[in-house]
Amino acid sequence: MYNYPLHKKINLSKIKQVIVSVGGCTNEEIFTMIKNLNQKKIILMYGYQIYPTTSRNLRLLKIKKLKEKLKNKNIVFGYADHSPNGLLETVYNCSSSIAMGATIIEKHYDPNPEIKKKDEDTSAIDTNSFNELIYTINICKPNIGKNIIWLDKDESKYRKSVSRSFFSKGDLKKDSKFTFDNI
């Protein structure tokens, strides 16, 4: 991250995009790196830098805050997941990161989970879990919607249909008038 001579070499190279892990980095280090690599498309991969990572440590809001601060830059945001507790926690964490603005997910993959591994590999998921994660993420992505704050066409139509309706608190006698007491 703070290898400034490397930043200069990358900037002068023909490399078009750079993937940078920013977990464990200060905001100052991140902003300096972005300034140094201003000629490149940058992919910032955020992940809490303890293996394995518990969900309460994630601080995924950092993705959203960095995205807001760097909105005019040529930057893509991603999330590197190190969840140790299986598919469900992985799905929650990855889906939450997408809601915060991540568009790339990194997840350790282990095609042979039955073989004993080092402690750092406890966050890896098997083939079936990986496929399930991809399926779930593809369902979640459209839920975020577009960056609009007004009603869409369907909401406007529905609102129009219900805003003209009256409902009584009980049965009304013939020819009775609506009042605030009976609607």
Language model segments and positions:
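Catalytic cores and adjacent flexible loops of soluble metabolic enzymes
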Residues: 1-183
